């Protein structure tokens, strides 16, 4: 089959928030870019998230003490951690390295790196969306964490102390304070925490679609195709992408395909442990309740967020790979909790979604040039923070590619960093 000629300077594989952001920042620097994805831009993992620009999400899932808690959590259907047991043998090597990073020293280093990429998330989103229709979907807001009582909050003191060390501001709310803040939260939680300086996206899928439209309107191109392989010349430069629509010629490539990056990365000789932390959401359409700010249900680890015309309840963690069907238990947990907390909730219909968060063993993304091939860059592995960190990751990648801001220390996001490859 004859190769299709692409005249763009750079091809970006993956059109979620990271890929679209990378394409936009490259385009704004005068580079011609083609985005490639098997799906429509922003329609996969970037679509179904909770819509939070979470500057304070600097705590990884594995923290001190979790190793003792995991068995009980997995065996309790009312806890927020799930596992497709058939996948356990395949996941054991990942879990071993993943849980090794739950010690306090590792968590502190990881939180430092997460803080760097998240502290200005709202500003980064405002900057990339400025002058586009996407900016209409961004709002600065608080983020509320609801607890059954103050003791439950104090049991989370490790995480809150670490957030405070990174400069994140929050205030406590009593039951009465919470009722004054939002009447819909009256008598729902015995204690709460209000985090300031966060942001929300009222419709993540449409938001990313609008960013993509601005990219296309300024000359960017999009190819709907599934990339199967990358072919190189004798000098380790990419020359073709092998896709289900034929071979596409190329000179420079950026790999930003989320959890689906793993297969192509292996072909590049990049041995980064990567798996899917599957997330779930239930949406209640045309609800009779609208919340002032998103609320984290702390004991169930999901967020309720009033979006445009619907209430999205999103979160949880399931380790189950990318090929297994969705599970019913996560949906049931969300529904049961919502029915218990808000029996007055009325709605027209419910919809269900499951997506794949790409997670590395140290909970940090890879933002780097390929260590083995020229003119190939990597940007994936953002676990729960993909939406929040997408624009900044795209800006960093564009600067690496164009040799700008070379004094930036990106060793913590290296494809060959200590603690990731063993």
Regions found by a protein language model. Name each.
Residues 8-35:
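N-terminal Rossmann-like FAD-binding beta1-loop-alpha1 element of flavoenzymes
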Residues 28-48:
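Glycine-rich FAD pyrophosphate-binding loop
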Residues 51-52, 57-101, 229-232, 237-238, ...:
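Active-site substrate-recognition segment that forms the wall
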Residues 92-213:
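Rossmann-like flavin
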Residues 173-181, 223-238:
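A conserved short coil-to-beta-strand element within the FAD-binding core of flavoproteins
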Residues 204, 299, 340-422:
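C-terminal catalytic lobe of FAD-dependent flavoproteins
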């Amino acid at each position: 089959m004859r190769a299709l000629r692409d005249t763009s300077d750079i091809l970006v594989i993956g059109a979620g928030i990271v890929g679209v952001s990378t394409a936009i920042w490259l385009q704004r620097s005068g580079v011609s870019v083609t985005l490639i994805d098997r799906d429509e831009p922003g329609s996969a993992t970037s679509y179904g998230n909770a819509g939070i620009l979470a500057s304070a999400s600097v705590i990884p899932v594995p923290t001190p003490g979790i190793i003792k808690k995991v068995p009980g959590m997995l065996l309790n259907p009312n806890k927020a951690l799930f596992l497709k047991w058939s996948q356990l043998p395949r996941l054991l090597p990942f879990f071993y390295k993943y849980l090794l990073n739950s010690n306090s020293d590792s968590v502190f280093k990881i939180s430092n790196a997460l803080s760097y990429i998240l502290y200005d998330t709202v500003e980064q989103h405002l900057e990339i969306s400025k002058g586009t229709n996407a900016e209409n979907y961004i709002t600065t807001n608080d983020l509320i964490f609801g607890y059954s009582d103050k003791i439950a909050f104090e049991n989370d003191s490790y995480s809150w102390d670490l957030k405070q060390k990174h400069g994140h501001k929050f205030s406590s709310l009593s039951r009465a304070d919470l009722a004054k803040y939002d009447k819909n939260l009256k008598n729902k939680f015995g204690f709460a925490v209000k985090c300031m300086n966060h942001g929300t996206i009222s419709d993540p899928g449409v938001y990313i679609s609008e960013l993509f439209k601005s990219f296309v309107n300024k000359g960017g191109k999009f190819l709907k195709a599934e990339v199967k392989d990358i072919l190189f010349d004798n000098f380790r430069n990419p020359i073709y992408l092998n896709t289900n629509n034929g071979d596409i010629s190329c000179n420079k490539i950026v790999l930003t395909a989320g959890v689906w990056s793993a297969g192509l990365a292996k072909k590049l000789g990049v041995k980064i442990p990567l798996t899917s932390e599957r997330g779930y959401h239930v949406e209640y359409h045309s609800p009779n309740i609208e919340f002032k700010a998103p609320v984290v249900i702390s004991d169930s680890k999901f967020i309720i967020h009033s979006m445009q015309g619907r209430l999205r309840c999103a979160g949880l963690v399931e380790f189950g790979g990318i090929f297994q069907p969705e599970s019913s238990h996560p949906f049931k947990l969300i529904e049961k909790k919502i029915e218990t907390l808000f029996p007055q909730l009325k709605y027209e219909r419910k919809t269900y979604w499951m997506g794949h968060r790409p997670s590395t063993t140290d909970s940090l993304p890879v933002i780097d040039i390929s260590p083995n091939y020229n003119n190939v860059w990597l940007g994936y592995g953002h676990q729960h923070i993909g939406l929040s960190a997408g624009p900044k990751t795209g800006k960093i990648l564009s600067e690496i590619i164009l040799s700008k801001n070379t004094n930036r220390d990106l060793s913590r996001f290296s494809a060959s960093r200590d603690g990731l490859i063993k």
